[in-house]
Amino acid sequence: VAAATVCRMNPLITAIREHEAAARFLAWPGDFDLDRGDHVEEVHLASGAALEGFAGDGAGGTYFFCGDGGEDRPVLYADSEGRAALVAIGLRELLQLLLVVPWWRDCRAFTVQQSAELEAAYTEDIPDLAVRRTRAAQALDLELPATADVMARLRQIATGAGEDYVLIFTPEGEPYEPLIKN
């Protein structure tokens, strides 16, 4: 019964674990690993809402679910350099970001042109990037929105999150810097 409950409550997390192609794409180039959910520092949300680390990246960054509930909760990303931002509303939206624009951390201008330049560089190293992306999306039953839509949504969420989603370094009571600025 417990495993069935986990699957119902976290269907996308379960799907990632069950589909090797999706997990591989998310691991690279997505730099997203479900086994790295522990953050390097003690942190909390300014609002006092629950914060649950559920994944991380190779550079020490962490993805957190904010508040109570399942995979539809807002997702905050905190890097290891003291910066954080709300990046998605729900795991489905985060996975679309990671599939469409896995280089989002380097795409600071939020333009399709900048994303295309980064994609070209990634494609040099991963010639079958588009095929792998499509397979991962199909395995997770996700649509792939247009790059412009994904980038606009990321900027909207990150810059419009408000004070409730400010991450605080608990030992010093100091806020993390915004990862994404207006």
Identify the residue ranges that each predicted region occupies.
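A surface-exposed partner-binding patch
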Residues: 1-82, 129-182
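Hydrophobic alpha-helical interaction segments
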Residues: 105-139
